[in-house]
């Protein structure tokens, strides 16, 4: 085990899997700066898939990492996730910090060891979004019965192991509500950070709408593509993933797809967009804040984290309109209250009649800076006993 920095406890970091550098991994990267000597435990690791900063830590993997195709098809091993996370040996550590959207919060620690779990979401594919990940008719019997059995077993495990962390941090009030509903536990809300200094409001022409993110079912990018089939407006789509072929088939003629873009290129794309489309119900959502930091308004579904970012500071009247299924202008752009393609199209048409000041939008992203995150999460770590005061 690596040596400790004086004044710091021997800390283990735990993350579900290290197969790409997405929002959760950026939070992990920021958290890891508090614990430069910590070992990093995970179910599966693809070398080179995450930042050099994370890979400077000693990375320890579960038995899943030795299975064929685990680095690319780890989701096939969903029934084994609980056993894999519980197999990680954390007996030699004084404190544990997990960043969890699946099973990381369920690691087993020694009695009395403080464990802070930063929770991005309870397992969405066995709770709220099971119907989207495993829709009726996707599998024939007996596979369908087996899938339901696995999901039910994972729900029981997920709730039972919610008592393992000594402190739970939710990344939004929306996630905190779901933690309370599914796990019966309270949490402290600390919003994730956005590297706002990477983005500046664009001063040039804004000529296209932007749709960006992982091509996953719960993102509902399909709704925006269907909406734009009836809108004569330019659309740029950035990202990739499991739904790539389906989304290409849905896209209207003239849609521009881009993949593998760098952080610098994405910042330029944000700055040239008329608006970012955000049709999914997200636990928090970093991309809307990145867009706003670029002076770009957001057209978002008015549920989940978008209400706390795009809708931050909105009037009660506007939020009530969205809650009732309508469309309303809010400080960060537009919110629509029905998750349908027609609602996206209506919101875009309403947006076309509005104007937004890029610098005002950029100022709305400033409270989500890294410095704010550092101060708030440090206070949690110190109170929980995973970080000594002043260390």
Model-derived regions, located:
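Acidic donor-binding loop of glycosyltransferase active sites
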Residues: 271-283, 296-297
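Membrane-proximal helix-turn-helix segments that form the acceptor-binding/catalytic region
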Residues: 135-168, 176
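Conserved donor-binding/catalytic core segment of Leloir-type glycosyltransferases
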Residues: 196, 200-236
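Conserved acidic donor-binding segment of nucleotide-sugar-dependent glycosyltransferases
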Residues: 312-341, 350-355
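A charged, aromatic-enriched C-terminal amphipathic alpha-helix characteristic of glycosyltransferases
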Residues: 339-342, 346-382
């Amino acid at each position: 085990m690596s040596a400790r920095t004086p004044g710091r406890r021997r800390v283990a970091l735990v993350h579900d899997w290290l197969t790409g550098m997405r929002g959760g991994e950026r939070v992990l990267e920021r958290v890891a700066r508090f614990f430069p000597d910590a070992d990093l435990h995970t179910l599966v690791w693809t070398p080179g898939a995450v930042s050099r900063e994370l890979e400077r830590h000693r990375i320890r993997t579960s038995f899943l990492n030795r299975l064929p195709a685990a680095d690319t098809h780890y989701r096939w091993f969903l029934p084994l996730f609980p056993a894999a996370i519980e197999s990680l040996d954390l007996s030699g550590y004084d404190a544990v910090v997990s960043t969890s959207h699946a099973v990381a919060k369920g690691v087993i620690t020694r009695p009395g060891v403080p464990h802070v779990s930063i929770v991005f979401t309870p397992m969405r594919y066995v709770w709220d979004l099971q119907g989207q990940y495993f829709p009726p008719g996707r599998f024939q019997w007996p596979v369908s019965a087996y899938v339901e059995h696995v999901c039910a077993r994972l729900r029981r495990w997920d709730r039972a192991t919610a008592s393992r962390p000594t402190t739970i941090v939710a990344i939004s009030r929306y996630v905190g509500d779901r933690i309370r509903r599914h796990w019966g536990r309270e949490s402290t809300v600390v919003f994730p950070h956005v590297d706002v200094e990477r983005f500046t409001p664009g001063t040039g022409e804004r000529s296209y709408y932007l749709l960006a993110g992982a091509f996953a079912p719960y993102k509902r990018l399909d709704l925006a593509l269907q909406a734009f089939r009836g809108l004569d407006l330019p659309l740029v789509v950035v990202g990739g993933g499991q739904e790539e072929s389906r989304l290409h088939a849905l896209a209207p003629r003239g849609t521009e797809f881009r993949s593998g873009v760098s952080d610098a290129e994405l910042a330029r794309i944000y700055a040239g967009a008329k608006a970012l489309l955000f049709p999914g119900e997200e636990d928090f959502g970093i991309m809307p804040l990145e867009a706003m930091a670029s002076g770009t308004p957001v057209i978002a579904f008015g549920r989940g984290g978008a209400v706390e970012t795009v809708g931050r500071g909105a009037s009660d009247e506007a939020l009530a309109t969205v809650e009732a299924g309508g469309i309303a202008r809010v400080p960060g752009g537009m919110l629509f209250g029905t998750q349908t393609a027609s609602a996206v199209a209506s919101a875009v048409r309403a947006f076309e009649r509005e104007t937004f000041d890029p610098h005002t939008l950029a100022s709305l992203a400033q409270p989500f800076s890294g410095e704010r995150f550092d101060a708030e999460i440090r206070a949690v770590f110190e109170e929980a006993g995973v970080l000594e005061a002043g260390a």
